[in-house]
Amino acid sequence: MKVGVALSGGVDSAVALYLLLKEGHEVKAFHMKTKEDEFFLKKEIKKKVCCSPSDTADAIRIARSLGVEIEIVDVREVFREKVIEPFKRDLLRGLTPNPCVHCNRYVKFGYFMDYVLSQGFDAFASGHYARVEFSGKYGKKVIKKGVDGKKDQSYFLARIEPWRIEKLLFPNGIYTKEEIRRIAEEAGIHVAKKQESQDVCFIPDGSIENFLKDEGITLSEGKVITEKGEVVGHHRGYPLYTVGQRKGLKIEKFGERLYVREKIPESNVVVVSGLEDVFFSGLIAEDPVWHVEVPEEFRCVCRVRKKSEEAPAVVRVRDNEVEVRFEKKVFAVTPGQIAAFYDEDTLLGGAIIKEGIR
C-alpha cells in the first residue's frame, strides 16, 4: 500500500515511518511548516514545541537515514486562518480554546492530509497514540484509545471528519511510549531520546500575553470579584485565566481559597468562588462531530480536557447541540474546550463546550 506519513521530526512519527517500512509499504514522508523559521529564532523557547527549524532538520535526517523521500509542505496560510485566528478570537471572547484539536481537524487531518492523498497515496499515517480498527458494533472503522493510557491522544482526534478514519493509519497505537523509544534506539533513529513537545507550537515561550501582544492586542488589568460583586483583587487580563484556575490571581487576603468561576469580557471582570462552585453537573456543547451514528439519547463516558478523568454521563443530542449530564460532578467544565465522548475505548466524537451546568 502507498502510505504518506506525517513526519514531525520527533520520535513518535519517526517510529511510525519505520514500522510502516518494516511492514513492506511504499512510503513517503511529508513535513508540515506551520510558521516561518525566523519566528522560532526570535522567541525564547521555554518548552519543547513542534514545527521548529530543528524539527525540520530532524525530519529530513530521519527520512534520509531510512531511505525515504521527504517533502516539506507549507501550511502557514491555512494554519493562520483555521488555528491562530480562531484561537485569538476565542480568547478575546472569554473562551479557553484548544488549538491542537482545531489543527487536527482543519490542518493536519484536513488540508495536509488532502494534499498527501492527492499525490496518489492510499492512506495517511501519523505517530499518534491511538488506534484505527473495524468495529463490529458500529459496522465501520473507528478510532480507539492507544494502549498506553498515559500517552493516549484520541481526545485530540475527536473532531476530525468521520470519512477520514478509513484512510488513517496509527502504527504506534499498540505500543507504549517506552516501547516506541526502544524501537527507535534499536533502529538507530537519532531522535530516540528527543524531548516531547509540550506546548502550543505558535506560543513557544508559553506566554499567551506575549502572543496577544505580538498580534497587536494589549491586555488591560481588571477587577477580580466574587459572585456577590465584592472586589477581592485584580487580574492582568481576562484571556490569561481559565475556569478552575487558582494560581496567578492577585487576590487580597480572603477567608477561603478562590478559583475562577467565569470571565465576563464585556466588563473585563474575572469572577471567583469557592472550590464547590467550580464543579459541574453537566454541560452544553455545540457543533458536534460524530464518528459513528448515535441515538438521540445515550450513555457514554465524557472527557472535558485531555487530562481530566472520564466521567460517566447521559448525552442528549438536539439539533446542533448536545446536553451532557454527569453521574458525578466534574471539575472545571470550561467553555471553548472539547467534550470528547467514548464507548469504552471507542471514540464516538466530540463537541465544543458552550457552557457548564451547575
UniProtKB/Swiss-Prot annotation:
Disulfide bonds join 103-201. The record marks 128, 337 as: Interaction with tRNA. It is found in: Cytoplasm. It comes from the Bacteria. GO terms for molecular function: ATP binding; tRNA binding; tRNA-uridine 2-sulfurtransferase activity. The keyword tRNA processing applies. Its main location: cytoplasm. Gene3D superfamilies: Adenine nucleotide alpha hydrolases-like domains (2.30.30.280), HUPs (3.40.50.620), Translation factors (2.40.30.10). Keywords: ATP-binding, Cytoplasm, Disulfide bond, Nucleotide-binding, RNA-binding, Transferase, tRNA processing, tRNA-binding. ATP binds at residues 6-13, 32, 127. Its EC number is 2.8.1.13. InterPro entries: MnmA-like, MnmA-like_C, MnmA-like_central, MnmA-like_central_sf, Rossmann-like_a/b/a_fold. GO terms for cellular component: cytoplasm. GO terms for biological process: tRNA wobble position uridine thiolation. Residues 151-153 are annotated as: Interaction with tRNA. Catalyzes the 2-thiolation of uridine at the wobble position (U34) of tRNA, leading to the formation of s(2)U34. Belongs to the MnmA/TRMU family. This is tRNA-specific 2-thiouridylase MnmA. It comes from Thermotoga sp. (strain RQ2). The lineage of its organism: Bacteria, Thermotogati, Thermotogota, Thermotogae, Thermotogales.
